[in-house]
Each structure stands twice: as C-alpha cells, then as structure tokens.
Amino acid sequence: MDKKKINVAIDGTSSSGKSTMAKALAKSVGYTYIDTGAMYRSVALFCLRHGLITDGKVDVERLLPMLPDINISFKIEDGKQITYLNGENVENEIRGLEVSNNVSLVAAIAEVHHAMVRLQQEMGKNKGVVMDGRDIGTVVLPDAEIKLYVTTSPEIRAKRRFDEMRAKGDTSVTLNDIIANVKMRDHLDTTRKESPLRKADDAVEVDSGKFATAEEQIAWAVDYFHQFMQGK
C-alpha cells in the first residue's frame, strides 16, 4: 500500500554533510529537495554584487527595497540541482569563501529570514519534501514528520569543505582559513537574534563524524526514512 508523503526537516551546523545527505535522501525516495542554504547564499551574493556589505555589516536600509527584485529558483541539470539568481546560474559562485563569510550576516536580518521562510513553507505545504538548513525543524516546518539534527567537530567539517573545494579546483584558501570560517559561522548561527540554530526538541541528533564516508551517512538516512515509514 502506498504511504502518504511526509516532510523531512534536516538542520545542523555548516559543512556537517547535511545537504549531501538531504539531497541523496530526496533522490532515493523520490521526494523534492529544497536547499535553503543556497537561498540565503544567493541573497548574500546579491548583496555583495550590489555593494551592500561593508566591514562585516549589511546596509539593511538599502537592501530591503531591493528584496522583491531577488528571484531564486532551482533547476535539475544533468542530475544535479542548480541554483539560479535572477535567471543566472550561480551554483558555483555561491559556494565560494566570500559568500560563506557573509551568508550568516544576511540570514540574521529579520526581513530576509521572514521572506525566505514564507517561500520555504510554500514549497513544503504539499508534503514530499526534504529540506535542510538551520531552522527547518524549529521554524519553517515545525510539523515535519522526520527531524534530524546533523553536526560534528569544526575540524572534521572544515576538512570536508576543504576537500570539496580542492575537488572543484579551488586552491584559493587554506584549511586553517576554512576552520576559522566554520567556527565563525557556528558562533553567528547559534547566537543570532533571529531564529538561531538549535536542535528541535523532537529531532534525532546525527554525529556525521562517526561515518567513514558520505555514502555511509546517506545509507543511514535512507534506512532511517524507510524504518519510519514502515512504522507509520
């Protein structure tokens, strides 16, 4: 008998492997994957391109009237999800260190956060969605049937991001740069006033450092999903 679709909320710290896990889980079970981090990264890129970030501060007064001009969409190309900002493929650019260093500043702006949450809730209203981010289980989809919270040490997470960047041919930053970035983002994400990163009371905590490979982490998530569905 075909089970009714559910929503899966995956939260966690930066570079914890949650997006890779969420993406693969969605593909495995035939659900839609929503990369909320890419949405905030796109807004950060927009701000950088328009000179709205100076000395670690966002010019909110200038940004707010421009928010309606920011159109973010996703397309599947060659089996991969690509992020578009106002019709332009920005998938690679939003993963760079400059955007990484500024995305938490942008996500902390209440008006930006509210606009993104509205869009994300609209995407999840018909179920069958796997969504990952910082506040999916606590704010965006508080009624999600499955909630996971993924994290591990800053050093393990930084090495993972470093290896990803090297694999793409990006040699512009050192491992120490990325460790510093990860720790800074942890601090900003957990202490921000607007919807700080925290584990939902009913979320299952996943230590991604205990998995030898990303494939092991994905296999665990897929198995967990199927066990949950069988128990419904």
Features from the language model and the residues they span:
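Hydrophobic anchor at the beta1->P-loop junction of P-loop NTPases
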Residues: 10
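P-loop (Walker A) phosphate-binding loop of NTP-binding proteins
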Residues: 13
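ATP-binding Walker
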Residues: 16
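Walker A/P-loop
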Residues: 19
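N-terminal phosphate/diphosphate-binding loop that engages ATP/GTP or pyrophosphate donors
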Residues: 28-95
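NTP-dependent small-molecule kinase module
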Residues: 85-91, 100, 159-171, 187-232
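ATP-dependent NMP and nucleoside kinases share a basic, alpha-helical "lid"
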Residues: 91-168
